[in-house]
């Protein structure tokens, strides 16, 4: 596998590799070619690249048309520009007819807006799409998982949203680990005091919290939840059933994302105490690591929240 760094480059490498053997793969760019690190794709496969300019709604409509002809289009740009500006088109012209369009939203989460701040920090995207039927929502944790998530998206029938970041993500997975369609991967099993669930680009911090807690005699299990509102949540429910309580951590608003998904599963299947860690307000500009610490995503802050929930 070629070398890449971060979720954006991972996306570009994935569609290039797929296009080598599948001429149905298309990239529709609403003036996002450079942002998606996909310039090489356009050079290698000019007939599989469509540029709409700064027109997200038009890009989604074009992709819907391509999908209706049997092609597999990917629309990639900033997460908020997709899910907010083009929400109606994603709903009515893709999800309603259940067309095979794939969306990749970059700069998702608080940590994506290091330079731009609130206008380029998108922590509502999963919540928005969670309300639209037929969407599969994939939330890979880092670059390697994004690469495999994009390839997995191409194999899923119907609309798929892949949540990607800014390129500053800390790599947790090696490049060979596939994207599991079970909806969860257990990474540490120290004990059943708490199930510590992560979604997206805070996984490295969640793993640190687990190690800090272990040093204090608190033994948790860590799970990476990589599909939100999975059609078959049986593996997630299995993990939930083995512990006394749950803490969720997500680089997203606590409404509509991982915390809401797990709370719904618990209420309907196995009620138990749940603590949700995520955003409850708008973000701000600043270095990604400092923002993560300030908004409660440090390993120490997560460990403290777990202890308070015991």
Regions flagged by a language model, labelled:
Residues 1-163, 168-169, 178, 299-301, ...:
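Thiamine diphosphate
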């Amino acid at each position: 596998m070629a070398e890449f760094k971060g979720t954006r480059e991972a996306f570009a490498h994935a569609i290039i590799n797929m296009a080598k053997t599948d001429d149905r793969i298309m990239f529709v760019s609403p003036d996002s070619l450079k942002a998606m690190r996909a310039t090489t794709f356009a050079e290698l496969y000019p007939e599989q690249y469509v540029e709409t300019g700064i027109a997200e709604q038009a890009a989604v409509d074009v992709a819907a048309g391509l999908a209706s002809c049997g092609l597999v289009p990917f629309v990639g740009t900033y997460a908020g520009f997709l899910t907010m500006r083009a929400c109606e088109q994603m709903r009515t012209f893709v999800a309603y007819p259940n067309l095979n369009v794939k969306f990749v939203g970059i700069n998702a989460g608080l940590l994506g807006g290091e330079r731009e701040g609130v206008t380029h920090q998108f922590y509502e995207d999963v919540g928005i799409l969670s309300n639209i039927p037929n969407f599969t929502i994939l939330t890979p944790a880092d670059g390697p998982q994004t690469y495999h998530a994009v390839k997995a998206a191409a194999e899923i029938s119907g609309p798929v949203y892949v949540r990607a970041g800014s390129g500053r993500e800390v790599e947790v997975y090696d490049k060979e680990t596939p994207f599991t369609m079970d909806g969860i991967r257990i990474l540490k099993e120290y004990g059943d005091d708490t199930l510590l669930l992560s979604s997206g680009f805070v996984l490295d911090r969640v793993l640190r919290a687990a190690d800090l807690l272990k040093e204090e005699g608190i033994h948790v299990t860590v799970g990476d939840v990589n599909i939100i509102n999975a059609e078959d949540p049986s593996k997630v429910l299995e993990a939930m059933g083995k512990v006394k309580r749950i803490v969720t951590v997500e680089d997203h608003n606590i409404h509509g994302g991982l915390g809401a998904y797990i709370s719904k599963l618990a209420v309907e299947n196995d009620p138990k105490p749940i603590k949700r860690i995520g955003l409850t307000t708008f973000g701000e500009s600043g270095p990604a690591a400092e923002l993560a610490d300030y908004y409660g995503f440090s390993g120490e802050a997560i460990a403290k929240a777990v202890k308070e929930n015991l």
